[in-house]
Amino acid sequence: MTHIPGIVITGASGRMGQMLVRTVTDSDKVRLVGALERPGHDWIGRDVGEAMGGQALGVAVTDDPLEAFAQAQAVIDFTAPAATLGFAALAAQARCVHVIGTTGMTAEQIAALEPAARHAVIVRAGNMSLGVNLLVQLTKKVAAALDEDFDIEVIEAHHHHKVDAPSGTALMLGEAAAEGRGVRLDDVADRARDGITGARTRGDIGFHAIRGGDIVGEHDVLFAAPGERIVLRHVASDRAVFARGALKAALWGQGKAPGHYDMVDVLGL
């Protein structure tokens, strides 16, 4: 009989957490074995399905990650940077595949994942969808093909609850554009324009963040030159695309050598 991997969902009460719970329980390729929330949360001890307003799933929400991870083969984590760092160490201890969709992580926090990646598989991406990861590759190719006569701007829009800006996906796109041009994003990123800023610096990559309503996620990469413009665009209308990508990553990571991977590896792009 084929072994069916057990999955733990962190931040189970959140919008993404609930979508992940539904996606895992709807799949015949994995099984839900754990649902985590922070200590003191009113879901602790309740069946996660009932807490979500549905049928019982036989999995009680817990605030003990090590106990939950001990039963699992993978952890899917869309939480916050500090929480993700703690989960990474515990997931590595349990030898679980750790799928990280958490955004807003600093370079130092990303580097802090490396000790865990020496012992377990980490798959981390600012966006888990196939479409966005294709957009990243296209952005890199277009940036490499065009010279600095084409200004590059990354514009993203999300719901009004999102706490970080630019989005992780916008930064992925900016990194791809910078890589295509053979420069470091930190050297050319322009994240703040307000007031009398002067003319645009040639070669900069600009970022713009829109927050409003219930926008799931929209990303545009604009290449603008005198007389012509190219726009690469991705629109997500349902969080399920991120959940499906995360589940694909969790399955892909089974049996892989320890290391720090991304969705390009998972999708073979």
Swiss-Prot record:
BP-aspect Gene Ontology terms: diaminopimelate biosynthetic process; lysine biosynthetic process via diaminopimelate
HAMAP family from the UniProt entry: DapB
Function noted in UniProt: Catalyzes the conversion of 4-hydroxy-tetrahydrodipicolinate (HTPA) to tetrahydrodipicolinate.
Keywords, sorted A to Z: Amino-acid biosynthesis, Cytoplasm, Diaminopimelate biosynthesis, Lysine biosynthesis, NAD, NADP, Oxidoreductase
Protein's recorded name: 4-hydroxy-tetrahydrodipicolinate reductase
Annotated PANTHER family: 4-HYDROXY-TETRAHYDRODIPICOLINATE REDUCTASE 1, CHLOROPLASTIC-RELATED, DIHYDRODIPICOLINATE REDUCTASE
Keyword tRNA-binding: no
Organism: Ruegeria pomeroyi (strain ATCC 700808 / DSM 15171 / DSS-3) (Silicibacter pomeroyi)
Catalytic activity: (S)-2,3,4,5-tetrahydrodipicolinate + NAD(+) + H2O = (2S,4S)-4-hydroxy-2,3,4,5-tetrahydrodipicolinate + NADH + H(+); (S)-2,3,4,5-tetrahydrodipicolinate + NADP(+) + H2O = (2S,4S)-4-hydroxy-2,3,4,5-tetrahydrodipicolinate + NADPH + H(+)
Active site as annotated: H158, K162
E.C. no: 1.17.1.8
